[in-house]
UniProtKB/Swiss-Prot annotation:
The keyword Transcription regulation applies. Residues 3-62 bind DNA. It comes from Mus musculus (Mouse). This is Homeodomain-only protein. The keyword Nucleus applies. The lineage of its organism: Eukaryota, Metazoa, Chordata, Craniata, Vertebrata.
């Protein structure tokens, strides 16, 4: 297991998560989520939680309503 703190993922893990969020998919399917979790050394639950929180942060920064999934919705 990686040197993850109780406050969240390590810098290296966040780098992997951010890359996938920004360059690959903001809404990963279960298989992709599993692969991202394995790459980052996190559980699927931790990865899913991170994506959910990061998506909410992204929505706020884009001025989108919280229930909106993407710009095209």
């Amino acid at each position: 297991m990686s040197a993850q703190t109780a406050s969240g993922p390590t810098e290296d893990q966040v780098e992997i998560l951010e890359y996938n969020f920004n360059k690959v998919n903001k809404h990963p399917d279960p298989t992709t989520l599993c692969l991202i979790a394995a790459e980052a050394g996190l559980t699927e639950e931790q990865t899913q939680k991170w994506f959910k929180q990061r998506l909410a942060e992204w929505r706020r920064s884009e001025g989108l309503p919280s229930e909106c999934r993407s710009v095209t919705d």
